[in-house]
Curated annotation (Swiss-Prot):
Involved in the post-transcriptional modification of the uridine at the wobble position (U34) of tRNA(Lys), tRNA(Glu) and tRNA(Gln). Catalyzes the conversion of 2-thiouridine (S2U-RNA) to 2-selenouridine (Se2U-RNA). Acts in a two-step process involving geranylation of 2-thiouridine (S2U) to S-geranyl-2-thiouridine (geS2U) and subsequent selenation of the latter derivative to 2-selenouridine (Se2U) in the tRNA chain. The keyword Transferase applies. InterPro entries: P-loop_NTPase (IPR027417), Rhodanese-like_dom (IPR001763), Rhodanese-like_dom_sf (IPR036873), SelU (IPR017582). PANTHER family: TRNA 2-SELENOURIDINE SYNTHASE. GO terms for molecular function: transferase activity, transferring alkyl or aryl (other than methyl) groups; tRNA 2-selenouridine synthase activity. It comes from the Bacteria. Keywords: Selenium, Transferase. This is tRNA 2-selenouridine synthase. Its EC number is 2.9.1.3. Disulfide bonds: none annotated. NCBIfam families: PRK11784.1-2 (NF008750), PRK11784.1-3 (NF008751), tRNA_sel_U_synt (TIGR03167). It comes from Aeromonas hydrophila subsp. hydrophila (strain ATCC 7966 / DSM 30187 / BCRC 13018 / CCUG 14551 / JCM 1027 / KCTC 2358 / NCIMB 9240 / NCTC 8049).
Length: 366
């Protein structure tokens, strides 16, 4: 087995989007993998668990023997055909298991005996993951970071779409970063969030980019946690403050979190099934703020929200949502933002309206 080829240029694998065949069990794949990987496991979750138990109780030799017993005969033939079929679709695919050990060595040998020789990752998933963590850490330490901040509803995410050097953290997290930030479809695992972020940074730095603009985020974007080195770099980075009137911000929130999000629920689930899910999303998001708002303020806001939802369900009109949105900005989000900004004013390098901030970023890049 040792004479068969190894893949060791991890940067090139990610830069070129080399297809990967992940031979780990489905439970391992679900915890974290890579965007170009396909899970075609050597063993099922149950088979892996049996082999693991055998290893603990009887040692390596017995565990290997059990593995060959479980994945032998017709099972081996069926799985081998699955790997061969994938390699017919993606003939340049590379194999990996967790550590580059027996699982990937075994499959590599079986494929070789079937007439197909493909490299395996020398250190497996563990080495690829370490490479991407180091990539993130290096980017956090070596790149120039600028943070775009502004009151809730300022349209910062929309602005970043017009900034060439923007890095969309919320896009990678599939979450808008507030109590109302949950999006239909759920979030990636934290490992996948980090992996995808690292790969984007690797590719962009390979193209020569060294300066990035990110939106002001807390450590957690939904359930996705920013890597400590990146969060620390953002916490010390210069700030650009976008200034938007409250009326305009309330309208932006209505558009993003009511009108557009309802369309996403409708597209994903259909109108009949999607409506109660959408209404529950808004209601639950407000409920998560109850402790900070206090019972009375929460009741007042919830009453306004339920009236707005009833009108929307009846007529399709979403304008009543502006009442609770404006009150929530006034009572909660705006005071919280002003307090937080007061603790970091010394980091502000520019502030102005949307166009002024976009012009600043364009000049910064030039």
């Amino acid at each position: 087995m040792s004479a068969l080829p190894l893949a060791t240029d991890y940067a090139r694998i990610f830069l070129d989007d080399v297809p990967l065949i992940d031979l780990r069990a489905p439970i391992e794949f679900k915890e974290g993998a890579f965007p170009c990987s396909t899970n075609l496991p050597l063993m099922t979750d149950d088979e892996r668990a049996q082999v693991g138990t055998c290893f603990k109780q009887q040692g390596q030799a017995a565990a290997i023997a059990l593995g060959h017993q479980l994945v032998g005969g017709a099972v081996r033939a069926e799985r081998l055909e699955g790997w061969l079929a994938q390699l017919r679709r993606q003939p340049d695919a590379v194999l990996y298991c967790f550590r580059g050990g027996l699982r990937s060595q075994t499959v590599q040998q079986w494929l070789h005996e079937a007439g197909v020789t493909r490299p395996r990752i020398a250190g497996g998933y563990k080495d690829l993951r370490r490479f991407l963590i180091d990539t993130l850490d290096g980017a956090a330490a070596e790149c120039q970071w600028t943070v775009l901040t502004g009151m809730t509803g300022s349209g910062k995410t929309h602005m970043l779409a017009e900034v060439a050097q923007a890095l969309d953290l919320e896009g990678h997290a599939h979450h808008r970063g507030s109590s109302f930030g949950q999006l239909p479809g759920g979030q990636p695992s934290n490992i996948n969030f980090e992996n995808n972020l690292a790969i984007e940074l690797l590719k962009r730095r390979h193209q020569g980019e060294q300066a990035f603009v990110v939106e002001d985020e807390s450590r957690l974007i939904g359930r996705c946690c920013l890597p400590n080195p990146l969060f620390d770099a953002m916490s010390q980075a210069p700030l650009v403050v976008v200034e938007v009137p409250q009326e305009e911000r309330a309208e932006q929130i209505r558009q993003d979190y009511v009108h557009d999000l309802w369309l996403r629920y409708q597209a994903m689930f259909g109108a009949e099934e999607g409506w109660p899910l959408f209404a529950a999303y808004l209601t639950d998001a407000l409920a998560r703020l109850k402790r900070r708002l206090g019972d009375q303020a929460h009741r007042e806001l919830d009453t306004l929200m339920q009236s707005a939802l009833a009108e929307q369900a009846s007529s399709g009109d979403t304008s009543l949502h502006l009442a609770w949105i404006t009150l929530l900005l006034t009572r909660y989000y705006d005071p919280m933002y002003l307090y937080q900004l007061g603790n970091k004013r010394e980091r502000i390098i520019f502030q102005g309206d949307k166009q002024a901030c976009l012009d600043f970023f364009a000049k910064q890049r030039a």
